[in-house]
Amino acid sequence: MRYQLTPIYCRPWLLNGLSQRLIESHYENNYGGALRRLNSITQQLESLDFAATPGYVLNGLKRDELIALNSTLLHELYFASLGGEGRDPKPFADVLARDFGSLDRWKSEFVAMGNALAGGSGWVLLVYVPRDRRLINQYAADHSQTLAGGIPILALDMYEHAYHIDFGANAVAYVDAFMRNIDWSGVRSRYDDAARVEPPRPLLQKEFDDIPGVSPEEVKAMLDAGKPVQIIDARPKHYFSRTQDIMAGAVWRDPERVQDWVGELSRSDPVVVFCVYGFHVGCQTAGALREAGLDAVYTKGGHSAWKAIGGPTQLHA
């Protein structure tokens, strides 16, 4: 067998409001069933002649493998999430407050998401996202829906098998019982491990490392805050003449004639330059302005990125 069973972590007889019978049934039948199904699928895949296997057969097996593997992993996290006293996680409250505004707001959203799945099925997951170095509450309608790149650290199983033995259709009472049994020390340990995972490496234009750039979100934040900033559209003339829109508040200037218009700019306010995609033209224009003594930066991703975030544009003459 390729995948080994993980012994149950929590002590079923000590849980508050969740019966030993419920936990045993859930662990043995649903978690165990997922693991057995996963190993059966794995065995089938290992024996396949991929070159001779019809595409629909391979697709079906890989789909079933994804569902069974995620079900196995999420159930292991679910049982690892139980066994505590469910008290407010003082050592972890600062992290939840940082990412959700407050501990109460995190709890309110997590519980509401569980209650919203009552009568249906799915998962509510507390997930760490290395890309943004933050936690989010994730909804999953089934075992195949998990956040790409996310690391789950707490799992609430909202499939009926997780509560019907004790609670029948009263999923709200089940969610309350789950919250009373969270092992926060385990959640914190998993968070600490997840937080050590580095975010994806940014793709850098190394030839422009010496020129500072800002994201379109940072540009929008400056404008929304009313900060004085000079926005220069430096898209090449031949490109600009074929387009209709320009970033709201920007003025177009020919990037090939910087010396002709640099004197128009205020030396007391920062300058943000953008071209089409944030490559050579924008960077070189920002570099020329910096050489002239201006506080200039280029916009990462250029005009295309500005439109992608929904930044306001207007028609140009």
Segments and roles (model prediction):
Residues 1-202:
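Feature for soluble, non-membrane regions of globular proteins
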